[in-house]
Amino acid sequence: EMPFTEDDFDPQLEQALELMPELLGDERAEIRYAINGLLSLTPDGYPILGETPEVKGLWSAAAVWIKEGPGTARAVAEWMTHGNPEIDLGHSDIARFHPHQKTRAHVKARTSESFIKTYGIVHPGEQYESNRNIRLAPMHASERELGAVFYETAGWERPFWYESNAGLVEKFGDACMPRENEWDSRWWSPIINAEHLQMRETAGLVDLSAFVVFDVIGPQALAAVQNIIVAQADVKIGRVVYTPVLDETGGFRSDLTVMRLAHDHFRVVTGGAHGMADKKWFSDRMPDGAVVVDLTSSW
């Protein structure tokens, strides 16, 4: 907490008086307590909550603003004592970050950009401009030549549509569901829907380089995987299983793909945005005789 400076607060107080003149203009209204606090910002704008992946039993409740303090404290306490909070905190899970998202350079770049947008009107699809191109797929250059429009997911540049497929919009017409509202049409293109329709008619290749990949290996690998996923894990070697992952209360945590590579060897492929949290979920539930090996950066 820093000393309160009225000069910094006066412009905001004048704006508040315009919005609530009857309340703040009342002669009985007064400032009981005033602080000049620092804003805690994170690379993606969400708090940093939960047990750290690096140290068992070390919990974080960081980047929590005053107005969210009581609710956050309750949720984290539930998480610590019961294993799951009453509300979903997946977007704020400290385990969500990839190693390249925790570097000092990345954190500084993103939080500096976030500060400017903190009280702005930010479109849900709006992309960060800072520190881009830190993770590129092997076919990135070819995708760019095809007119790919890249969005970032967990540091990876992923094509959301290809301008070279613009002709498909005319082919499918209204089936592309064009968006007439200007706000809805920001950070979007009807080419997205046209590409989906074309793939349903023919075939296509989807770049999944940004997905998280980790193996579960050991004599207890089958028991470990079966304890975590909903689908049957005891399948023939070479089979691929698409399955939900539930928590202890039956709540939905994730959907992912599991491949059985050997009797005691399973490979898990899951989304890039939540994949590191999925890896921690598996790691926390490994019995003696099974280990998790992260292969995300091995390709």
Language model segments and positions:
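Well-ordered, non-transmembrane segments within structured domains
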Residues: E1-T52, H196-L246
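Glycine/proline-enriched, intrinsically flexible loops and inter-domain linkers
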Residues: H98-W299
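C-terminal catalytic lobe of FAD-dependent flavoproteins
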Residues: P3-R135
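Short, well-ordered beta-strand elements
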Residues: E1, W59-A62, F266-G271
